């Protein structure tokens, strides 16, 4: 086998490989003979079909298969010999064939050489937060509101009330599509409606008819309504006030607490809040570390890896539509290219961090991650056992653990400053509620 390597552009490489022609001819001949022994063709006894007949019928297909196998096998031998690391499947182009040799070309991309830079320039503001008694009480208050019952009242509507109404919206005196409703139910303070709508309901009683003036936001989804001034003629039919459950052992029982009553509920709430806080703190720091790593390291990315990631993201997006992908048009690659490229770059950079620091997934960390995730379920032991018995899930958790270890390794050289933050403020930002 003779091999020549050509760097065409960027990460693309072109291998020209020559193998003795007799290698292919022998393989074709052997394959034809095997086929002749097992072929069943009318007019010939089993196992007695002449090779010439087999060659006439199947020779072209057999030669094509053999050629493909020879190209694949010799390609693998060539990249090993040349110490090349393909980032995707090669494209084979069969070339000339004569009595002496068979020549073909393999084109593919290689992984980039990654040299980590600027690790000591990564800046991280590490948030420090804890769950206080006041945070637990605030969560209990939220749970009370979620389990509130509502009853009609004969007073002015206030924040937190539920109201029922009929309304008709108009712009420049003309009703618009989607601007009319009957028996519409709304909780005041929920922020469901456009700015000014809920505020216009406050202070009115059931049975009143009134008009409120609002402006549609510039970013409103309907093009014909963006930034437009509108009027809503409203008939308020009912005002309902919330009746919150008392915070006692009966309240705790609503959440499956059979022993320990209210104190047991508070303990469980604190545990869940601590788990969510720990996850959010880790995610916040990781996001900053990754951002710094990306900013300080510009590397060329193999198109093959980006294309593969685009396909993954596209499939995930299709599944979010309910899995009904059969009759859906394929989503354009452009929708996912930027995100795919970012994920590929992160993977390559973190891979180099793992390699440089000789990191291996720590079993204790893997089991800790599984236990933390399982604690959110009714029977954690069942979830833990399931993960430990599933090779694919365990590999996923090892990857998560390795990523954590890589981030921790980067933190050692980063410029880290700590900042005390309140639980509610931090979690609101983390969940996008701020």
Curated annotation (Swiss-Prot):
Domain of life: Bacteria
Keyword Isomerase: yes
E.C. no: 5.2.1.8
InterPro entries per UniProt: PPIase_dom_sf, PPIase_FKBP_dom, Trig_fac, Trigger_fac_C, Trigger_fac_C_sf, Trigger_fac_ribosome-bd_bac, Trigger_fac_ribosome-bd_sf, Trigger_fact/SurA_dom_sf
GO cellular component: cytoplasm
Top-rank EC class of the record's enzyme: isomerase
GO molecular function terms attached to this record: peptidyl-prolyl cis-trans isomerase activity; protein folding chaperone; ribosome binding
GO biological process: 'de novo' cotranslational protein folding; cell division; chaperone-mediated protein folding; protein transport; protein unfolding
Main location (coarse class): cytoplasm
Reaction catalysed by this enzyme: [protein]-peptidylproline (omega=180) = [protein]-peptidylproline (omega=0)
Comment, domains: Consists of 3 domains; the N-terminus binds the ribosome, the middle domain has PPIase activity, while the C-terminus has intrinsic chaperone activity on its own.
Family, similarity comment: Belongs to the FKBP-type PPIase family. Tig subfamily.
Job of this protein: Involved in protein export. Acts as a chaperone by maintaining the newly synthesized protein in an open conformation. Functions as a peptidyl-prolyl cis-trans isomerase.
NCBIfam families: tig
Protein name (database record): Trigger factor
Organism: Shewanella sp. (strain W3-18-1)
Lineage: Bacteria, Pseudomonadati, Pseudomonadota, Gammaproteobacteria, Alteromonadales
Gene coding for it: tig
């Amino acid at each position: 086998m003779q091999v020549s390597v050509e760097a065409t552009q960027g990460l693309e490489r072109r291998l020209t490989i020559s193998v003795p022609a007799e290698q292919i001819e022998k393989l074709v001949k052997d394959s034809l003979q095997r086929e002749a022994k097992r072929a069943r063709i009318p007019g010939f006894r089993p196992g007695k079909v002449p090779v010439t007949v087999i060659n006439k019928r199947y020779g072209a297909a057999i030669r094509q298969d053999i050629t493909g196998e020879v190209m694949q096998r010799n390609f693998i031998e060539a990249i090993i010999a040349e110490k090349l690391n393909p980032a995707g499947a090669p494209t084979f182009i069969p070339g000339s064939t004569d009595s002496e040799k068979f020549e073909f070309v393999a084109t593919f991309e290689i992984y980039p050489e990654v040299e980590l830079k600027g690790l000591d320039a990564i800046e991280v503001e590490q948030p420090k937060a804890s769950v206080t008694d006041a945070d637990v009480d605030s969560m209990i208050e939220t749970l009370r509101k979620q389990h509130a019952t509502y009853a009609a009242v004969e007073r002015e509507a206030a924040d937190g009330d539920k109201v029922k109404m009929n309304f008709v919206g108009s712009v420049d005196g003309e009703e618009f599509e989607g601007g009319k409703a009957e028996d519409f139910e709304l909780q005041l303070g929920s922020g469901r409606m456009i700015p000014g709508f809920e505020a216009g309901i406050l202070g009115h009683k059931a049975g009143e008819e009134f008009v409120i003036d609002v402006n549609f936001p510039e970013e409103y989804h309907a093009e014909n309504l963006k930034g437009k001034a509108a009027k809503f003629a409203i008939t308020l039919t009912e005002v309902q006030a919330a009746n919150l459950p008392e915070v006692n052992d009966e309240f705790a029982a609503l959440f499956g607490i059979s022993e320990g009553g209210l104190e047991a509920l508070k303990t469980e709430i604190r545990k869940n809040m601590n788990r969510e806080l720990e996850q959010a703190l880790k995610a916040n720091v990781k996001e900053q570390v990754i951002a710094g790593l990306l900013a300080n390291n510009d590397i060329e990315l193999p198109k093959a890896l980006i294309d593969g990631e685009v396909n993954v993201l596209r499939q995930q997006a299709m599944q979010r539509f309910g899995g009904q992908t059969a009759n859906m048009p394929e989503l354009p690659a452009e929708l996912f290219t930027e995100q795919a490229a970012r994920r590929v770059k992160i993977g390559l950079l973190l891979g180099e961090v793992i390699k440089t620091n000789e990191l291996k997934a720590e079993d204790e960390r893997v089991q800790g991650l599984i236990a933390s995730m399982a604690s959110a379920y009714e029977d954690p032991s069942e979830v833990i056992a399931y993960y430990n018995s599933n090779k694919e899930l365990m590999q996923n958790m090892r990857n998560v653990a390795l990523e954590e270890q890589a981030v921790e390794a980067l933190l050692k050289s980063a410029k880290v400053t700590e900042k005390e933050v309140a639980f509610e403020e931090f979690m609101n930002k983390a969940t996008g509620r701020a």
